[in-house]
């Protein structure tokens, strides 16, 4: 119920997929298990915008989640979707929510366009306050400064951040988990989710 954040519980809720899969190989993630390999397939921007427009026009649904693992991976794709939503006059009506990696939100122009197109929330996979733990799970080489800068960059464009953290990754220690809590407190994002790592067969 992310739309309740703004105090407007009247709208419905829907989900629209604009891509499938992920090109990364984070060791804790099973998104690519069904496909046997890392990769991503994109729906066309016209298709994505048309689905969102139909939800607004035909069902008065303006609270829409885009559950793609890597929505911000391809700035060209993101811009194309945003332009189509703006051209349809939907930006001011929408409350969109999407997911991204820390190292895919460096494009200021893209973030500004996303806000204009109706994106109000971005879920960021931070996972751990320890660079060693992140690297050990193939999460990326970014450090805590990169994490903080990415969060502030997104927020500066009027987009709320939902931060995601995981406890119990293979290299996690008590000290690393304390660092994760400290980072979460320091960032103080609008929302935070804390998960426990789970082994899967």
Predicted regions and their residues:
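Flexible glycine/acidic-rich beta-alpha junction loops that bind and position SAM and/or redox cofactors
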Residues: 24, 75-76, 132-137, 167-175, ...
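Catalytic cores of alpha/beta
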Residues: 109-112, 171-186
């Amino acid at each position: 119920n992310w739309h309740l954040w703004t105090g407007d519980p009247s709208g419905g809720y829907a989900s629209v997929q604009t891509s499938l899969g992920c090109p990364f190989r984070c060791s804790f993630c099973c998104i690519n298990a069904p496909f046997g390999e890392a990769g991503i397939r994109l729906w066309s921007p016209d298709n994505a915008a048309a689905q969102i427009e139909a939800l607004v026009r035909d069902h008065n649904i303006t609270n829409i989640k885009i559950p793609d693992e890597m929505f911000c991976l391809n700035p060209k794709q993101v811009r194309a979707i945003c332009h189509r939503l703006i051209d349809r006059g939907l930006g001011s009506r929408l409350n969109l929510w999407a997911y991204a990696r820390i190292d895919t939100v460096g494009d200021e122009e893209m973030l500004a366009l996303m806000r204009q197109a109706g994106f109000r929330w971005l879920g960021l996979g931070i996972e751990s306050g320890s660079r060693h733990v992140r690297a050990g799970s193939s999460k990326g080489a970014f450090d805590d400064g990169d994490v903080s800068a990415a969060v502030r960059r997104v927020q500066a464009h009027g987009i709320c951040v939902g931060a995601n953290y995981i406890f119990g990754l293979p290299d996690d220690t008590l000290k690393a988990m304390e660092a994760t809590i400290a980072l979460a407190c320091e960032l103080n994002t609008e929302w935070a989710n804390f998960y426990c790592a789970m082994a899967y067969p």
